[in-house]
């Protein structure tokens, strides 16, 4: 049952990101994918919490509805594809030679902002800055670190 619930949520995430795959500019695709991921997380915090913040058994390949590697259904392969396209276009710093590691780093940064907002966004102990600004700042900081010419596009 938990696998079916998670499958629905993962399919919804992939569906929401699908049109981003058609953007012609690789840097614009990265920007849009990161923002789309954050929007999904923050518009569906309970789903996101179950999908990415709750320990659970690994995906059961025998019963999942999601076809691994299918860009129509698999949000992780969407991320990898977008990053690989940018990698193949020479957008990343030359010393960064593993596109999957770059993809996982981008994901981790945006996930951090989203999960902190979901878990602690109403914590009065922390004087949180504007959420949209935090997302944009994280996205900018990561891209400044990995892109060869971050201001070129």
Which residue stretches match the model-derived regions?
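Amphipathic, non-membrane alpha-helical segments in soluble helical-bundle scaffolds
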Residues: 2-3, 7, 27, 68-76, ...
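An amphipathic alpha-helix signature
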Residues: 31, 35, 76, 80-84, ...
């Amino acid at each position: 049952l938990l696998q079916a619930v998670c499958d629905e949520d993962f399919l919804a995430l992939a569906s929401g990101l699908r049109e981003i795959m058609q953007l012609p500019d690789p840097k614009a695709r990265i920007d849009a994918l990161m923002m789309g991921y954050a929007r999904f997380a923050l518009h569906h915090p309970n789903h996101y919490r179950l999908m990415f913040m709750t320990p659970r058994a690994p995906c059961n390949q025998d019963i999942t509805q999601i076809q691994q590697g299918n860009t129509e259904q698999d949000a992780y392969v969407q991320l990898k594809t977008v990053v690989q396209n940018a990698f193949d276009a020479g957008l990343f710093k030359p010393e960064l030679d593993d596109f999957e590691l770059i993809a996982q780093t981008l994901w981790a940064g945006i996930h951090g902002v989203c999960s902190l907002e979901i878990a602690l966004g109403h914590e009065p102990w922390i004087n949180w800055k504007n959420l949209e600004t935090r997302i944009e700042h994280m996205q900018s900081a990561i891209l400044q670190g990995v892109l060869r010419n971050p201001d070129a596009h």
